[in-house]
């Protein structure tokens, strides 16, 4: 089963790229011209129209706003969103994004611009990357254009490509957060060896992130003792982070230290009583030692905390399955896929149906997960939830297909990191 331990790259990216101030929020009303005030009124009207999903009207307001103030970065971002929603011209969409990225803006405004990138189709993304490549050549010493390209690639789950662009940014300026992103992206690309090398390069000012990433990667590699030491390091650095104890609990389970795992999951709950996966995993540990009353209590608590599908993942389907409520497990999974049809959701669905013994649906959802970008191929082949399909010829065909795709993605990564700014 997929665990949700990845970095929130967009949020961190925007915090470390704070390159200006948002005009509509930080400029005093008395410091604006009448024209700028009118531009902001149109912008605010556009926001209201967008909330009503009237994107055509919002587009008209934003165009009027930009006529009055052509330096209004947030207006370009929202105009691009409106064009996406109304199936506007691809060239116009990507041009507006570039204009928004070129202008000085706050972290909040930058987040708006980057969020638009994540709404693009593959074709729109390719055009945006082409335009970002032009900006990279024009401003070869500005790391931000490579970082923007990384986010564009990440929006299409092109993990190798995103890692390559972040590496280009690091070559300009050794930003430790970008180095952490590289390690995390290479992990998601399924290349644990390169991911570990990247994690080891993270500077001492991010010692916690370095240790946490190493723990996750080493666990994926099956180096459980080393992974355990890495989680111990995380806890020594900051004893109040629930995720460190959760990761250590998962590792102790692999090492058959069930009592130790229970203690760690209990610590997670002490630190964060809303951590639903900790209740589920502790319930699993109680079940392994035959304490079914405690297990059921934890399962029910996990369900109480996971009443609706969430983008960051749900323990609920697996809890229902542990309680023997197969129909509810399936129904909840279906609701997740309806609302959040991303690669992680499909991978979890494949695991659920693997546990249910439904080979056809397990393979179908695994194929969907891979199609949407899931690339941890070695993990897939050793995941106990997928044992039921791992010997099927169709499974081997799918893995071979995406191994070839992954190899091509790796070649693209090498091409990016070895290219010159003038190329």
Language-model features, listed with the residues they occupy:
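Helix-start (N-cap) detector for alpha-helical repeat units in TPR-like alpha-solenoids
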Residues: 32, 39-40, 73-74, 107-109, ...
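Register position in tetratricopeptide repeats
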Residues: 51-52, 85-86, 119-121, 155, ...
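Canonical positions in the second alpha-helix
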Residues: 65, 99-100, 134-135, 168-169, ...
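N-terminal leader/linker segments that initiate helical-solenoid repeat arrays
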Residues: 22-63, 67-78, 84-91, 95, ...
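Residue-level recognition of tetratricopeptide repeat
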Residues: 47, 81, 115-116, 151, ...
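Structural marker of alpha-solenoid helical repeat scaffolds
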Residues: 68, 103, 138, 171-172, ...
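Canonical tetratricopeptide repeat
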Residues: 78, 112-113, 148, 181, ...
């Amino acid at each position: 089963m997929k665990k949700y331990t990845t970095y929130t790259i967009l949020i961190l990216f925007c915090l470390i790229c704070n390159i200006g101030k948002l005009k509509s929020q930080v400029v005093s009303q008395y410091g604006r011209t009448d024209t700028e005030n009118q531009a902001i009124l149109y912008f605010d009207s556009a926001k209201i129209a967008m909330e009503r999903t009237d994107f055509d009207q919002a587009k008209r307001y934003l165009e009027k706003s930009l006529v009055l103030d052509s330096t209004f970065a947030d207006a370009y971002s929202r105009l691009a969103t409106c064009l996406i929603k109304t199936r506007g011209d691809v060239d116009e969409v990507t041009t507006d994004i570039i204009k928004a990225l070129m202008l000085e803006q706050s972290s909040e405004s930058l987040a708006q611009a980057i969020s638009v990138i994540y709404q693009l189709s593959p074709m729109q993304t390719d055009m945006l990357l082409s335009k970002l490549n032009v900006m990279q050549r024009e401003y070869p010493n500005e790391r931000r254009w490579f970082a923007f390209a990384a986010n564009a690639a990440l929006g299409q789950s092109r993990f190798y490509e995103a890692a390559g662009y972040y590496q280009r940014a690091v070559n300009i300026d050794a930003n430790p957060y970008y180095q952490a992103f590289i390690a995390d992206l290479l992990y998601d690309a399924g290349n644990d060896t390169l991911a570990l090398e990247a994690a080891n390069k993270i500077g001492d000012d991010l010692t916690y992130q370095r240790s946490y990433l190493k723990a996750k990667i080493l666990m994926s590699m099956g180096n459980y003792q080393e992974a355990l030491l890495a989680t111990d390091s995380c806890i020594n650095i900051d004893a109040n982070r629930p995720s460190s104890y959760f990761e250590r609990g998962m590792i102790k389970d692999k090492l058959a230290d069930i009592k130790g795992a229970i203690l760690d999951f209990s610590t997670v709950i002490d630190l964060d009583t809303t951590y639903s996966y900790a209740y589920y995993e502790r319930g699993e540990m109680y079940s392994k030692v035959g304490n079914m009353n405690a297990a059921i209590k934890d399962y029910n608590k996990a369900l109480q905390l996971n009443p609706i599908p969430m983008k960051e993942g749900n323990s609920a389907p697996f809890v229902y399955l542990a309680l023997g409520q197969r129909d509810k497990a399936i129904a909840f999974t279906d609701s997740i896929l309806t609302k959040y049809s991303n690669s992680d959701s499909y991978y979890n669905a494949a695991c659920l149906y693997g546990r249910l013994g439904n080979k056809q649906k397990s393979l179908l959802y695994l194929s969907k997960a891979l199609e949407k970008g899931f690339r941890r191929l070695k993990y897939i082949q050793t995941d106990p939830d997928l044992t039921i399909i791992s010997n099927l010829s169709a499974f081997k065909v799918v893995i071979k297909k995406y191994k070839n795709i992954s190899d091509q993605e790796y070649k693209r990564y090498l091409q990016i990191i070895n290219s010159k700014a003038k190329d």
